[in-house]
Design a protein with these regions (language model features):
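Electrostatic cytochrome c docking/interface patches
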Residues: 1-16
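Pocket-edge positions in alpha/beta enzyme catalytic cores
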Residues: 5, 50, 71-74
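Gly/Gly-Pro-rich "capping" loops immediately C-terminal to redox-active cysteine motifs
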Residues: 10-14, 26-60
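The canonical Cys-X-X-Cys-His
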Residues: 13, 17-28, 82-86
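Axial heme c-ligation environment in periplasmic c-type cytochrome domains
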Residues: 33-41, 61-89
Length: 89
């Protein structure tokens, strides 16, 4: 979804992504940086781990980490904003 069509929550989520995720994940490609690229993450049938990309699974991985990905400290609002942004990719 083009940035011009984002709502306020998605725009806040993009800011959370820049602060917490961008150093390890590209947003507009599936090519890996330190972690997998996030393009179409919520639209694929399985994440690189093989698990489905449900909001619940994305929340668990974000908050608790997995493999090389560390746990991330986010407020509930930041997490919801980030999920809204991930759905735009």
């Amino acid at each position: 979804m083009p940035e011009s069509q984002w709502n306020a929550q998605q725009a806040r989520g993009a800011h959370v992504y820049q602060l917490k995720c961008a150093r390890c994940h590209y947003p507009t490609t599936t090519r890996p940086l330190n972690g997998p690229g996030l393009q179409a993450l919520t639209k694929v049938t399985a994440m690189p781990s093989g698990a489905p990309p449900t909001d619940e699974r994305l929340t668990a991985v974000t908050l608790h980490g997995r493999g090389m990905m560390p746990a991330t400290q986010l407020t509930d609002d930041q997490l919801q904003d980030l999920l809204a942004y991930l759905h735009t990719l």
